[in-house]
């Protein structure tokens, strides 16, 4: 499943990078926004189908009754967190394609090291929560990153072109973004 969503992220970053590099910054921003909405919706749909069909699907692997229950609930947990995770992943890839490699990477590593890993460890080792509760803590940094990165995506500050045409279009793009911000305020 991860390879499929990685492919969507790569395709999104290519589309965004091509537009930003060509100086079509508004179109690059539009593609990134669309990808950050459509790809998580695809993730949600696929995981929902898998959750609904978990019995026939996972019975192919000869899992016992207890394992089947766990896979069902793990899919339900991932139904929510997977969509959020895909959104964050897509945003990060689009940031990189738009010339911003630092913000998404720092948020990803920082979220894991300072939020998810400690929270998961505390949930499992200190609080002795059941496995499924501990499993859900693995994805907690995704919520934090979603809340921080989504406004960053929408503001377009991550667009930092590396090419001549992209750089030439940057000042006008920033002016348009400021005007949009003033109209929205």
Residue ranges of each PLM-predicted region?
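Alpha-helical transmembrane segments of multipass membrane proteins
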Residues: 2, 42, 46, 50, ...
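Residue-level recognition of transmembrane alpha-helices
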Residues: 39, 75-78, 82, 108-109, ...
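Small-residue-rich hydrophobic transmembrane alpha-helices
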Residues: 1-54, 86-107
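Alpha-helical transmembrane segments of multi-pass membrane proteins
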Residues: 1, 65-91
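Membrane-interface helix-loop junctions in multi-pass transport and translocation proteins
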Residues: 54, 60-62, 68-69, 102, ...
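Intrinsic disorder in cytosolic terminal tails and internal cytosolic loops
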Residues: 159-185
């Amino acid at each position: 499943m991860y390879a499929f969503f990685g492919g969507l992220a790569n395709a999104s970053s290519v589309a965004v990078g091509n537009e930003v590099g060509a100086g079509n910054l508004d179109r690059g921003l539009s593609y990134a926004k669309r990808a950050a909405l459509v790809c998580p919706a695809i993730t949600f749909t696929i995981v929902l189908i898998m959750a609904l069909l978990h019995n026939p699907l996972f019975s192919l692997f000869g899992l016992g009754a207890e394992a089947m229950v766990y896979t069902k609930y793990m899919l339900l947990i991932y139904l929510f967190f997977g969509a959020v995770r895909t959104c964050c992943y897509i945003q990060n890839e689009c940031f990189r394609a738009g010339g911003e490699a630092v913000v998404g990477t720092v948020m990803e590593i920082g979220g894991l090291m300072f939020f998810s890993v400690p929270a998961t460890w505390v949930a499992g080792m200190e609080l002795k929560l059941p496995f499924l509760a501990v499993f859900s803590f693995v994805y907690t940094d995704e919520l934090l990153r979603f809340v921080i990165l989504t406004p960053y995506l929408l503001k377009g500050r991550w667009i930092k072109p590396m090419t001549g045409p992209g750089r030439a279009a940057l000042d006008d793009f920033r002016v348009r973004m400021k005007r949009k911000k003033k109209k929205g305020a």
